[in-house]
Amino acid sequence: MAIELSEQEQLRRQSLKALRDLGIEPYPAARYEVTATAREIAENYDDTKHNYDDVRIAGRIMSRRIMGSASFFELQDHTGRIQVYIRRDDICPEGDPTLYNTVFKKLLDIGDFVGVEGFAFRTNTGELSVHCKRFTVLSKSIRPLPVVKEKDGKTFDAFTDPEIRYRQRYLDLIVNPQVKEVFVKRAKIMATMREFFNSKGYIEVETPILQPIPGGASARPFITHHNSLDIDLYLRIATELYLKKLIVGGFDGVYEFGKNFRNEGMDRTHNPEFTCMEIYVAYKDYRWMMEFTEQMLERVSMAVNGTTELEIDGRKVSFKAPFRRLTMTDAIREKDRIRHHGPDGGAAARGLQAPERRDRRHDGQGQTDRRHLRTVLRGGAHPAHLRLRLPIIEMSPLCKRHRDNQDLTERFELFVNGKELCNAYSELNDPIDQLERFQEQLRLSEKGDDEAMFIDMDFVRALEYGMPTCSGMGIGIDRLTMFLTGQSSIQDVLFFPQMRPEKKVVADPVEAYTAIGVPEEWVPVIQKMGYITVESLRKLAPGKFFNDLCGFNKKNKLGLKAPSIDEVKAWCSEQE
């Protein structure tokens, strides 16, 4: 018996072989025709109509209650769980009890996939079940699932360790059904947005992920190299510039759900790889986009949750249009954080940050204003459009100057519960102004701003051919999903969030164990028990370790000569 496997893994591999010895393929190639799901049966079964007299379901065994010649097990498919009643005389009609007594009772385990043919009924206790007339092994699980127990509405031994949940999301989805609902809602969010955009006649497009120049945002990019072309390329940080080129090309409205990548920090609301939706519509401005965004989010909230009234971090938030609107100056006055000077918002904005908040790397007034604004607005309880009156060049290099004040930009951001959700402009379409702003970004970069935008001359050339008045909006899908599903971390709305590599302790060589007196044949046994370094033996109580060794030897029928208690004490003692 291979001791590198756990006892359960060994037994399951033995069952795997036994199934094949009986002529049952544990991983059949043929399709299995499913006619109903657990949810469909639960929602549509009618005791008087007997509408599920011939049903085929398939899924994973999640629990079993074996009771002699009849048993129950719980089957889980992608929609939920349903109880299955199985009886020996039903599945073994020719008198050979092997299929029930051996295959079902001994060779199948929790986690295995099976197909069930039978009919729906209610047990004497009223529980909706499927009476199995025939079952098929569809896939054998050779690694046991975590055992999560429920009783009287309480969960015991829950699978909650975030580290394991995020690394093994497939396992998280199996044992925590509520996790799947988060991702079902995420898909609903995106589907509803697509329906909304398509109903307006806008076109979904795809633009390059590998780009020669990373543009459309102020961020640090990931860099890679294309061997065939022998050039460096960047993973995109935004879809903006390519989408605007399509507006130049004659599209009236385009949108893209795109993966963006930013080589920056990670926290509860940021992941280096994230999904963003950007949309650009010709002949519109940022005021139109405000109303458009309100309508979209109201529709999405209703589609996903059936209401526009939500609770986020204990605060009531409404996605019912219209949202509250403030200028940046009004938002700051409301928080009473700084003293304002001048009747117009521009003067107050230009003097926003306190001296100690200035960015000494490149003296970037706009960047410091933005950081301070985030601090000022953090903790707000209502969705609010913010017309950010920010310095033109540093803060909004792709945004049109405000029609009433050339020191400001036509831009808004939507904050929900103190966090930015979306960003929108009246898009800059003056090619000369755009080039000047790119050049200013270059000067900032030379002063040390590693997030300043690159100069994209192809984009400037596109603008020179003429781009109509246009409004654009970008919204983070991950963050929107967090809000609409009540999750506090972005990792909970990503199937496979970015994480550090698993830490793996390197096992000591056999020689390290034999040097302290451990017989060579006992080394793999000790390491299998979890003590993969000599140092780990120092922390053990010799008496208990001795009993564990002898018990492991006997249980697994290894036939090894047991060490004496004194020998074990020597292994566990500090060596000279």
Segments (PLM) and residue ranges:
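Compact, charge-rich alpha-helical regulatory domains located at protein termini
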Residues: 502-576
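Class II aminoacyl-tRNA synthetase catalytic cores and aaRS-like
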Residues: 1-505
